[in-house]
Amino acid sequence: MKKTQTWILTCIYLQLLLFNPLVKTEGICRNRVTNNVKDVTKLVANLPKDYMITLKYVPGMDVLPSHCWISEMVVQLSDSLTDLLDKFSNISEGLSNYSIIDKLVNIVDDLVECVKENSSKDLKKSFKSPEPRLFTPEEFFRIFNRSIDAFKDFVVASETSDCVVSSTLSPEKDSRVSVTKPFMLPPVAASSLRNDSSSSNRKAKNPPGDSSLHWAAMALPALFSLIIGFAFGALYWKKRQPSLTRAVENIQINEEDNEISMLQEKEREFQEV
């Protein structure tokens, strides 16, 4: 019985070990995003609609996988938020905005460190250097929220993955910063910031190829672990089968011996009588 339990526990631990890469494919920087992101809506409401925020926008957010632009975009967001923080006083009426921006700066700085730790050093990038542009609070924080969403699925990129963007793409043509697009902030509840987006939003944000690779990375370890689990189960069953057969035979022999002994005992008692 103890041997059976040992084999079962071994198979369970093996399954968990093989599923470990599957868990790591889900946003490795995701835990850096705190509930303070929900204050973005309040901050946008507090800022004048015609207030302009400077941001060095990284082109290609619509046409490239997130790992291509997120490392640069998050740095530029950090710089812009830091500049914005310096413009607000940390006393009196500016305290609310100052506190919100300060928390957002801390989040973005943590994401910068996470990207540096997990980005591929051999990744080739061919897009132009970001150029400073002016954005309204709605436009700026739309880019901010989309960058935050990208971290939900951020994984380590393949070393052979190239990030090439067409030379004809300009910030003005990028629909992500189109000034005519209505401002739609994502839900600000903490659960929605940590849960997956809807399938339609995922398709809009990620190219089909990137999504296919993501699902392949999830499916292959799962399939491999199932095959290994069945193989160990078959080997264990094959090993245990002869011993089980012998055990059944021994039980039958013992029962027959007991019956014979009982009959002999009764026969002796009858003869004595």
Curated annotation (Swiss-Prot):
Segments in the Cytoplasmic topological domain: 238-273
Positions annotated as glycosylated: N90, N118, N145, S167, T168, T180, N195
Statement: the UniProt record of this protein carries the keyword Lyase: no
Origin: domain of life: Eukaryota
Signal peptide boundaries: 1-25
Modifications after synthesis and translation: A soluble form (sKITLG) is produced by proteolytic processing of isoform 1 in the extracellular domain. Found in two differentially glycosylated forms, LMW-SCF and HMW-SCF. LMW-SCF is fully N-glycosylated at Asn-145, partially N-glycosylated at Asn-90, O-glycosylated at Ser-167, Thr-168 and Thr-180, and not glycosylated at Asn-97 or Asn-118. HMW-SCF is N-glycosylated at Asn-118, Asn-90 and Asn-145, O-glycosylated at Ser-167, Thr-168 and Thr-180, and not glycosylated at Asn-97.
SUPFAM superfamilies according to UniProt: 4-helical cytokines
Disease linkage: Hyperpigmentation with or without hypopigmentation, familial progressive: A disorder characterized by hyperpigmented patches in the skin, present in early infancy and increasing in size and number with age. Hyperpigmentation has variable intensity, and sometimes is associated with cafe-au-lait macules and larger hypopigmented ash-leaf macules.
Protein name: Kit ligand
Origin species: Homo sapiens (Human)
